[in-house]
A protein has these predicted regions:
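Conserved short beta-strand elements that form part of the metal-binding/catalytic scaffold
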Residues: 46-98, 140-163
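N-terminal beta-strand motif that seeds the catalytic metal site of vicinal oxygen chelate
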Residues: 2-36, 44, 105-112, 167-169
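Extracellular/lumenal glycan-associated surfaces
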Residues: 24, 28-30, 38, 80-85, ...
Length: 169
């Protein structure tokens, strides 16, 4: 195991972390309205801010390096210090729609802070990994790293705080 040294029964990194704080959990759902009712009525989670994402809301939206136009509905709320994001795809081809078809509803990605967005993206490219999704939203660059093979989940990084976080709750 490169970059890791054993100390007693713990693994201790020998490099600086590329992920420093969990900011968001992205959950893909089939029906946003039904899911919101379940989250609010059954679990008391909310209030939620709802948005519709259209192709005009992103600059240079790409999936696996290919330019795409996608639409989806989103809802955001804060649970403690972590934003919960519900995502309903409005097309059949997006990474979210494919996730639903293959795995059903559930956690699609975890968004984390990273000390250097560009270096983290470059490191993935050096490993030969195409970004799952990337683009710019409200001036913030976002990238979904293909860490699902290594970590069992997609990691989202951004070069700023999501705009929705400033407006939720």
């Amino acid at each position: 195991m490169e970059n890791v040294s054993m100390n007693k029964s713990r693994y201790i990194p020998t490099r600086d972390p590329i992920f420093t704080e969990t900011m968001q959990i992205g959950i893909v759902v089939r029906n946003l309205d039904a899911s919101l009712r379940r989250y609010v009525d059954d679990y008391g989670i909310g209030p939620w801010e709802i948005h519709e994402f259209t192709p005009r809301d992103a600059n240079n939206l790409q999936e696996y390096g290919q330019s795409v136009e996608r639409s989806w509905r989103l809802a955001f709320t804060m649970v403690g210090r972590v934003m919960w994001e519900l995502i309903e795809p409005l097309d059949e081809e997006s990474v979210y729609a494919r996730f639903l078809a293959e795995k059903g509803e559930g956690v699609h990605h975890i968004a984390v802070a990273t000390p250097n967005f560009d270096d983290t993206v470059a490191e993935q490219a050096k490993r030969g990994n195409s970004l799952v999704l990337s683009g710019e939203f409200s001036g913030i660059k976002v990238a979904y790293l293909p860490t699902d093979r290594d970590l069992g989940m997609i990691i989202e990084i951004a070069n700023g705080t999501p705009v929705a976080e400033e407006n939720v709750n």
